[in-house]
Amino acid sequence: VLTRPIIVLFSFACGLAVATIYFSQPLLDTIGAQFSIPTAQVGIVLTLTQIGYAIGLLLIVPLGDIVQSRRLIVGQTVALAVALLATAVSPNAWTFLTSITALGGLAVVTQVMVTYTAVHAAPARQGWAIGVVTGGIISGILLSRTVSGVLSDLLGWRSVYLIAAAAATATAGILMRVLPRATRSRTGLHYGQLLTSTLRLLRDEPVLRSRSVIAMLIFAAITVLLTPMVLPLTAAPYHLSHTEVGLFGLAGAAGALGAFKAGSWCDNGLASRVTGIGLWLMSAAWLLAATLRWSLIGLAIAVVIIDFGLQSVHVANQSLIYRLDADLHGRLTAAYMTFYSIGSAAGAIASTWAYSTHGWTGVCLLGASISLGTLTYWIGNSSNSGTEAAADIDSRCRDNAGHACTAQNGAHWS
């Protein structure tokens, strides 16, 4: 069983790893100018990063079911440091885009750690543990903008990736020392069978399928908000610096509290309710985001609300899918998070196009449409299936050993 200090360490390590793929968001204008990438196409930086992430999810994360997690986590973290270094010293656009795609693929170490947490946390505290680690991931996503903005203004954009490479190297050393040597998973599948099994899960598991679609849509929505945000903030009438743009990441980090609390609620069988509240919040917050032309305060509040809603739904999603089968956690994570990457990649390229053609109003309309579409999908899916409700009941009936108390609570299932 994982101890609290190791769970907190995982939260930090996940935050660092995932931050590396979002460092570029507040720097898109600078990177575009450096490598002569037009404004309408600069979203390709984030899109390629997410494509790399999706490839890593499909090809690397399932290995957690057959390879020792300690070796996989440490090895990926070292390789991530190398990719960060290559990104920092890129001499031209092609090298930069290739390096940042590889960086995205290696950053999936976060999901290997989430899977490790789900498998080894005490069953009665699984939701809380996932919430802590997920809180670290989302905090890393948001604080990455603050860190990269400050470092870019002080030392140039390349320093962001150089310092991150050093931090990743140090983190790999710490993880090597503290992670126990675990036995290899008992599955007898070969690698090819493992990948096929991952795809088959999407066909056979309705909870995984529906929650993956929700993940794709909510991450598309938040990417639509955050990717082009640097463009109006650095232009008239605000003319904010990269450091000041990065401060919006601090506002969003307040929403990270949602992941911690949502995990506890899900442990108490409230995953469906958490999902509904989170999706309503995300949909309504776009009204505040649309006030950017008059005030920065509305945008800051919108970032907090949308992030809070997203994190709550994301933790609820994971809480439900990780109850399916402990021996499949690596493949469940890969299947679920692949949809997250698809949504993020699509949101990045669509949002910069929307901004270049319709301005900030177009961005807000796009984001609101995605959020309302997600809410509509969830309502329709929930009314047609009792699978998730059964999973919520099961979570309320789990004792500290992780056994479902169906004998004592059989009436709940009828």
How does the language model describe each region?
Residues 55-93:
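Conserved MFS/SLC helix-loop-helix module at the cytosolic interface between two early adjacent transmembrane helices
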Residues 57-68, 258-271, 355:
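Helix-to-loop junctions at the C-terminal end of transmembrane segments
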Residues 272-317:
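C-terminal transmembrane helical hairpin of 12-TM major facilitator-type secondary transporters
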Residues 71-85, 165, 273-287, 368:
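Structural signature of the two symmetry-related core transmembrane helices
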Residues 131-177:
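Helix-loop-helix hairpin linking two adjacent transmembrane segments in secondary transporters
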Residues 180-212:
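Juxtamembrane intracellular "pre-TM" segments in multi-pass secondary transporters
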Residues 100-137:
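Cytoplasmic helix-loop-helix junction between adjacent transmembrane helices
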Residues 109-121, 312-325:
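Intracellular juxtamembrane helix-capping segments at the cytosolic ends
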